[in-house]
Amino acid sequence: REKLEVQCQAEKVRDDLQKQVKALEIDVEEQVCRFIELEQEKNAELMDLRQQNQALEKQLEKMRKMDLRQQNQALEKQLEKMRKFLDEQAIDREHERDVFQQEIQKLEQQLKLVPRFQPISEHQTREVEQLTNHLKEKTDKCSELLLSKEQLQRDVQERNEEIEKLECRVRELEQALLSVQTLSKRWRTRNSFGAVEPKAELCLEVQLQAERDAIDRKEKEITNLEEQLEQFREELENKNEEVQQLHMQLEIQKKESTTRLQELEQENKLFKDEMEKLGFAIKESDAVSPQDQQVLFGKFAQIIHEKEVEIDRLNEQIIKLQQQLKITTDNKVIEEKNELIRDLEAQIECLMSDQERVRKNREEEIEQLNEVIEKLQQELANIDQKTSVDPSSLSEEADSLKHQLDKVIAEKLALEHQVETTNEEMAVTKNVLKETNFKMNQLTQELCSLKREREKMERIQSVPEKSVNMSVGDLSKDKPEMDLIPTEDALAQLETQTQLRSSEESSKVSLSSLETKLLQLESTVSTKDLELTQCYKQIQDMREQGRSETEMLQTKIVSLQKVLEEKVAAALVSQVQLEAVQEYVKLCADKPAVSSDPARTEVPGLSQLAGNTMESDVSALTWRISELESQLVEMHSSLISEKEQVEIAEKNALEKEKKLQELQKLVQDSETKQRERERQSRLHGDLGVLESTTSEESGVFGELEALRAESAAPKGELANYKELAEKLQEELLVKETNMASLPKELSHVRDQLTEAEDKLSHFSEKEDKTEVQEHGTICILEPCPGQIGESFASQTEGAVQVNSHTQTPQIPVRSVGIQTHSQSDSSPEEVAEIISRFTEKIEQMRELHAAEILDMESRHISETETLKREHCIAVQLLTEECASLKSLIQGLRMPEGSSVPELTHSNAYQTREVGSSDSGSDWGQGIYLTQSQGFDTASEARGEEGETSTDSFPKKIKGLLRAVHNEGMQVLSLTEGPCGDGEDYPGHQLSESWLEERRAYLSTISSLKDFITKMQVQREVEVYDSSQSHENISDWRGELLLALQQVFLRERSVLLAAFKTELTALGTRDAAGLLNCLEQRIPRTEY
């Protein structure tokens, strides 16, 4: 048995092993299929990547070609500019050579024409030698300039070669990019087996991070180089400005030197004429005695000495001119260097753009490589999860991966070598920049030396003027001695003296003109300072005016808000009164239908007519009230839009404030610059500086004119705001007229009510007579609480509907009639239970109302305060900005002072508005109080008049109804405020808790109405079932009418007393206000 069991188990094990082997074979086949599919997919991806790389290579070649073309075009343009510049310089130098040759020829001719005296000839030979030396020096300088030109051309060629080298480097970098792409391909192939050796991946990631760090460092270096280039540009601009100023001064000095040279040439001609005349005189005077000849020779020696002094002065002037020519040549060299520096900057910018482009391409390629690596890693992870790898295949793959890693490392070394080459290139560029810095420093030093030489030139120019004055004085002293010379010599000397005097006078005139110009400029500066001070004063005045205007506008806004609140409250109170009167009329019309005599059949028709008329009037009034509410909503929306406009205007005002501050800074800077330049002009006499200050002042005034144009825009905005305010006032007046028409309609409705009451009293008298005749005795009737309750319920319903502003359908009041067939017995226990329920509900509602009332009050107060503050701040800012702009404009238009327009708004109108709003609020409060007091007194009067009824539950119902009414009126008074304060509370945005409370409130009112109708039906059935009752007791309807009349009389007396107090308070101060009050109060008090 054991053997059999062992055999069976062995067979089972063998079967299991065979099954496992089959399953493993199936798995292996599936894995092989998957590997084949993966290899196919990888091959397809590799083909796609090759195609993409080929496309990228083509695009790169195209981009290279385009870049090379652009660079070649730019270089050709630069070469053309350089050629043109060199041609122009060559033309200028040839022109200068021609001028120098002409001057040399003139000087040679003058030397030939000079008479041949022995002492004079030696001196002139010396001068000729000096001049020849000067000419040799000038020719040497010209040759040096030619050599410098050739050097510049060589520098241009060297830089072109450098540009070509840089292009070769760019190509090398592109090749490096291609090698990076090949690396990326190999990386992808390697990462397909990345799960085997994660260490290699980590090494590659570390290398990538190192490359990225190196790229970041290079970017930082590039940014630093850019900043240095910007600094060099600013320095170059400043130096170019200084060079331009020096050019201007040199041109002025050239003009002065040319004028002086012309004068000296004229003097030389005159001197030659004099010498010829003297030679003739000497020939004629051979017969003169030797003593006279000695005197004449002594005088001639003096004259010759004076002329030698003049010749020395002329030589000094020639030296100065030569120095000026040197300065001009130096300036030209500086300009050439500046142009070369600009060219270098342009080349550096091109290189920077190329480097940025290469860097961006590298980053994009690295991102693509990272994405591909991530995808391959995910695929490998999935494959590793699904399949298991054989050790032999793993070893082969590891060997292949090691081989690939070796290749990648070699390529990385090549890349590092390329990075080192790029670093070396960056170092070369840094050296170039340092050289440019050194050149710039040299140029600054040269400019400083040129300035010093210029100052020396100015000092030297002042010296010959003094010598001229001294020579004039010597000539004036020697006049009596020269009287012995013949008349021709005297005339020649007089001519020279007159010429000297004319030159002195011209110099004096020029100096006086310069002094007058300086005085004019100083006066203009002082006037402009005064204008600026006036502008500042006017700005302050306009700010104060703006503040006063904002305060006036705030007071007007507050008064208008109060008027709106009071009018809304009055409209709501009138609506509640109309609804109460309408329901009372319905009840009064339904009651006479109880009578059973045929004479009572006339009553329902009349009551229906009165009810129809009342319903039509009430519907018209409700329609008008809804229109007023819609207008209020529009007003709220317009206020919101105005607030938005005010915010926009505030932003514009802030921007204009910033602009004004900038202009003030510019004005201050210009003032400081003016002072500094005035000092410089006084020290050096530089008129160019003053001209620049005047130009800057003109620029500042142009900016002020632009500000004037900009300030016209806020003026237009202010005008628009004023127009909007006027429109709002007109709309308020229209609404006031509509509200004034409402009391007239109310009085008309009240008249109709009085007529209906008279008819009802007449019919009630008839009913009393018939009842006395039929029954003889009538039981004592308590005043029916159903009517009062229903009237109060209707009032509360109206209050809830007004507060919620939702179009909820009113709950229809059940018509109370005599239902003889429906007799319902109600025990006192049920009544007590109902009363307890209602009391509990009322207490819950009171608690909820108290909590919500507190929340509403706090929210309302906080929101109103925030809105008022924001509005006040906005208006203040706007008015201040507008005032400042107005003051600026007026100050610029009227520099002597402008009369500030005073805001004379009508205070009488404001006081009238406030008075009318106060009177309207007093009237609304009086109506509200008298109405509530009237209902309370009427109910109390009817309760205290002593009906002998055994049941006590109607009094409890009265108390419940009073509580409900009081809470409804509290809700009314609280919910009317936010609607009038300018806050927009539409009906569809009410909270859910408020809607639930309203529903509970309406359900309690409907249940009360049902209960009251039941009690009323029961009472009336008992009255008509009882055959005998007391005789001499009046009907409850007559008592109710008397109570209503008393209430209305009390209202009238209260209103008359209030009116008298207002009349005594006002007196005869405002006749128009009194008339308005009378017109408003007469239709209200007439009842």
Swiss-Prot record:
What does the record list as coiled-coil region(s)? 5-461, 614-773
One Gene Ontology cellular component:
centrosome
Q: Where is the composition biased (Basic and acidic residues)?
A: 667-685
Molecular function (Gene Ontology), one example: protein kinase A regulatory subunit binding
Q: In which tissues is it expressed?
A: Highly expressed in gastric parietal cells.
| Residue ranges, annotated region (Disordered) | 667-691
Name the Gene Ontology biological process terms.
maintenance of centrosome location; microtubule nucleation; regulation of Golgi organization; regulation of ventricular cardiac muscle cell membrane repolarization; signal transduction
Q: Where would you find this protein in the cell?
A: Golgi apparatus; Cytoplasm; Cytoplasm, Cytoskeleton, Microtubule organizing center, Centrosome
In which broad location class does this protein mainly occur, judging by the first location in its UniProt entry? Golgi
Its domain of life reads Eukaryota
- Sorted UniProt keywords: Coiled coil, Cytoplasm, Cytoskeleton, Golgi apparatus
| Signal sequence region | none
Q: Does the keyword Coiled coil apply?
A: yes
- Function of the molecule: Scaffolding protein that assembles several protein kinases and phosphatases on the centrosome and Golgi apparatus. Required to maintain the integrity of the Golgi apparatus. Required for microtubule nucleation at the cis-side of the Golgi apparatus. Required for association of the centrosomes with the poles of the bipolar mitotic spindle during metaphase. In complex with PDE4DIP, recruits CAMSAP2 to the Golgi apparatus and tethers non-centrosomal minus-end microtubules to the Golgi, an important step for polarized cell movement.
Swiss-Prot/TrEMBL domain comment = RII-binding site, predicted to form an amphipathic helix, could participate in protein-protein interactions with a complementary surface on the R-subunit dimer.
Q: How does it assemble?
A: Interacts with the regulatory region of protein kinase N (PKN), protein phosphatase 2A (PP2A), protein phosphatase 1 (PP1) and the immature non-phosphorylated form of PKC epsilon. Interacts with CIP4 and FNBP1. Interacts with chloride intracellular channel proteins CLIC1, CLIC4 and CLIC5. CSNK1D binding promotes its centrosomal subcellular location. Interacts with GM130/GOLGA2; leading to recruitment to the Golgi apparatus. Interacts with KCNQ1; targets protein kinase A (PKA) catalytic and regulatory subunits and protein phosphatase 1 (PP1), to the heterodimer KCNQ1-KCNE1.
Name assigned to this protein: A-kinase anchor protein 9
Classification of source organism: Eukaryota, Metazoa, Chordata, Craniata, Vertebrata
Q: Give me the gene this protein comes from.
A: AKAP9
